[in-house]
Regions:
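Metal-cofactor-binding active-site regions of metalloenzymes
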Residues: 1-139
Length: 139
């Protein structure tokens, strides 16, 4: 049976396909080779190592255009798996470096990409704003 799916706990950066991250890193000449295993998947040993890999993978996302591309890549992959609705956690700690003006630009880029995905692939994205708890309350 092929039922439509919903995704209720998706972190946009965490859902970044490894091939997308490798490609963007290559374009920007950023070395992130240590975050992948021999098969090209993300490699981590425990939760704290996972957080470091997550941050390293996210480090290639530096502009609103990068987040638009990421949004399209994640939603295309989700739609191909039968997802029709996704609730996505978004953090100003990653998108825009805690700058409210930049945050708006990133959200605008994400929203435009999500609207394009909805028109093309029939998948709806809604955002949930969240802090990054391991950064601590001071940030």
């Amino acid at each position: 049976m092929n039922l439509p799916k919903i995704e209720l706990h998706l972190h946009l950066e965490g859902a970044a396909p490894p091939a997308f991250v490798r490609g963007l890193a290559a374009e920007k000449k950023i070395d992130i080779s240590g975050i992948f295993d021999e098969r090209g998947n993300y490699a981590y040993t425990d939760f704290w190592h996972f957080l470091k890999v997550y941050e390293a993978a996210s480090s290639v996302l530096t502009t609103p255009a990068d987040y638009a591309r990421l949004t399209r890549a994640v939603l295309a992959e989700s739609a191909a798996a039968g997802v029709i609705y996704s609730e996505c956690f978004l953090s100003p700690d990653f998108c825009g470096g805690r700058d409210v003006g930049a945050w708006r630009e990133y959200l605008h880029a994400i929203r435009e990409a999500a609207e394009e995905a909805e028109r093309q692939d029939g998948i709806t994205l809604r955002g949930i704003v969240t802090p990054i708890r391991h950064f601590g309350p001071g940030k």
